């Protein structure tokens, strides 16, 4: 009777509390909009984001991240790849990214999308400040990234995307 109902309410309440805590502090999902991460991610892909990642360790080169952008009165979340880390000197000419003078190997780029002369705006030599990263989309000609936004503060990183979970045909670890 009443005891069973009370037990049921407690179980549901605890489950909701746990779900809210996980969503708020640990894990989020993100729906990819636009084509800036083609061909790694496609519009409509859904990814899980570890929101604790950068509370436990610093961002890493190559990490796929969700970042929070505020431009004037507009707020939105973007998904990009970390290319440059604090203290790095980054530059890009004719689609070739150099970090501290060394060519950055980027096996995740689709050579049919990023081709010499077709990679959007270049990057003049820039040193990345402390507690900031330089992000770019894998679809270089079609990405709104640090080339336009500037370097991104660590505090604007929502977390590290680590898996595409939907649609099933696109399932992959990032």
Regions from the language model: what does each represent?
Residues 1-5, 9, 21, 25-31, ...:
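Soluble "head" domains of membrane/secretory-pathway proteins
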Residues 11-19:
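Hydrophobic alpha-helical membrane-embedded or membrane-associated segments
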